[in-house]
């Protein structure tokens, strides 16, 4: 185990609004550099809660457990400090930010990210046009990454996610990932709401970004995304804990049989949907998190 591994130990998480109702009930998981781990599970099993807890979402409280990342106790860090440690979260439901152009948003995000790596008191990360990445370098970088994701360059002048289709929103999430080059990427149901063509383009973009220095936690409900992105390990999350792990064959088994046989083997038939409270805060709290990319 190295400092570049994400190490989750006995993690228990509950909603702030109902701290006695734990959604995650003892998650143990290690994601190493260059590894892709897929988290699959029925609705309400705690998949999104895991993603949000790792990034410090204010709607959730860690009741016990530990998370180590880059040699630090992640749970003691603020959201912005987690992001500056090269962690990235792609949302399942990206929010619109009227009045903020994609170009300004991306440049501010890049500046904040680079300041996290190399602090410079003369640069204001909240100002996209003062200091930070030179405009020429920024334009070249964004054009290169847009081409990778087959995005129209005109999207840079539009307001963030305002009037975007589902596919455009997901591609913008991937564009953020591409320009920021995180060392740990958490992709929360990136395949949801995508038709087969958009799914293929997004998956090809993710594959092009995979590298030996980046770990990926890929959260998905369906096996179809794994037809394009090959995971090193597949985990089944149900009733707030990982009940089974395996290779890609496990995802194929889930596609063929569904979750019921595995849940039944664990005596969890009645647990399907038990964790539904995790879904409640998703849309309400996302705008504040969007800047944490």
Predicted ranges, named:
Residues 40-42:
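The feature captures the beta-strand-to-loop junction immediately N-terminal to the Walker
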Residues 95-183:
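ABC-family P-loop ATPase nucleotide-binding domains
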Residues 186-190, 197:
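Walker B catalytic motif
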Residues 213-221:
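Conserved H-loop
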Residues 237, 241-264:
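Conserved beta-strand-loop-alpha-helix hinge in the C-terminal portion
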């Amino acid at each position: 185990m190295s400092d570049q591994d994400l190490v989750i130990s006995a993690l228990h998480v509950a909603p702030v609004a109902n701290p006695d109702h734990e959604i995650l009930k003892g998650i143990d998981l290690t994601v190493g550099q260059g590894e892709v781990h897929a988290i699959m599970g029925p609705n309400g099993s705690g998949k999104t809660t895991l993603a949000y807890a790792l990034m410090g979402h204010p709607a959730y409280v860690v009741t016990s457990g530990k998370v180590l990342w880059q040699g630090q106790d992640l749970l003691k860090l603020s959201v912005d400090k987690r992001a500056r440690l090269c962690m990235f979260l792609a949302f399942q439901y990206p929010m619109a930010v009227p009045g903020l152009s994609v170009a300004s948003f991306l440049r501010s995000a890049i500046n904040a990210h680079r300041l996290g790596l190399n602090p410079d008191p003369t640069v204001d990360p909240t100002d996209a046009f003062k200091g930070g990445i030179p405009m020429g370098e920024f334009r070249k970088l964004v054009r290169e990454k847009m081409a990778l994701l087959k995005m129209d360059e005109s999207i840079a002048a539009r307001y963030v996610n305002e009037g975007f289709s589902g596919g455009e929103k997901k591609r913008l999430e991937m564009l953020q990932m591409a320009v920021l080059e995180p060392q740990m990427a958490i992709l929360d149901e990136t395949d949801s709401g995508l038709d087969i063509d958009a799914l293929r383009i997004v998956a090809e973009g993710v594959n092009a970004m995979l590298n030996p220095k980046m770990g990926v936690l890929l959260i998905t409900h369906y096996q179809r995304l794994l037809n394009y992105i090959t995971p090193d390990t597949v985990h089944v999350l149900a009733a707030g804990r990982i009940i089974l792990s395996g290779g890609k064959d496990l995802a194929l088994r889930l596609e063929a049989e569904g979750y019921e046989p595995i849940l039944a083997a664990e005596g969890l038939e009645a647990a399907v949907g038990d964790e539904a409270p995790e879904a409640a805060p998703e849309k309400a709290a996302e705008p504040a998190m969007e800047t944490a990319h």
